[in-house]
Amino acid sequence: MRTFFSLLILVFTLTDISAQRKYVKPEFVKNWSKPGKHPDHIVLNFSEDPATSISVTWRTSKDVKSGYGEIAKAHANPAFISRAETIEAITETINYSNVVSEYDRDNPKSNKFITLNHNYHSVTFKGLEPNTVYGYRVGDGEIWSEWIQFKTAHKENAPFSFLYVGDAQNYILELWSRLIREGYRKAPDASFIIHAGDLINDAHDEHQWHEWFMACLLYTSPSPRDLST
């Protein structure tokens, strides 16, 4: 009996020590969140009629002066990419002022601010067939993203599922990403995802935005964010 109580005390003591352990936040490599020539922050967006059209946006460095989207009906045979249609994208340079360049979550007053110029590209694929799987990729004609699949909506009313999440805000990539994975595990055929509430803590923090994109764009369903605050 004495041995049992000794072991019990040891277990509770170790549990308490483990619970008190200081959390070590992850370090990000320099320029981790900055765009380059390879497309990132790729988002599939609803268009006027999701049964016959869909829009895509993505980000690059300002060195990439133009962009293109390619699309084709997707099949198990990878030869489908040989039938892809190429659409020229609209490219815009966006100037961001007061962007956090050196990020310290625990001491925000120490953050340093800079101005950034990034290029954003957008393309709308039209004339698609309802309830059909397509593959698409985006790039500048030489440097491309991977091929990403989506399915157009039914033309008539039909049941569908979607994910609704809110207030990502804190520990976005390191912890909130679990929610996205679990959501798609429970609803693997979700047609889209709605983000409500506070997506990040600081609208001018490039690191937080990149965390958000990295966390939720593990999946490429249409991702409306109109309900965010």
Mark where each language-model region is.
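Sec-dependent N-terminal signal peptides
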Residues: 4-12
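C-terminal segment of classical bacterial N-terminal signal peptides
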Residues: 13-17
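Active-site beta-strand/loop signature of hydrolases that rely on acidic residues for catalysis
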Residues: 58, 190-202
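Active-site metal-binding loops of divalent metal-dependent hydrolases
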Residues: 166-169, 197-199
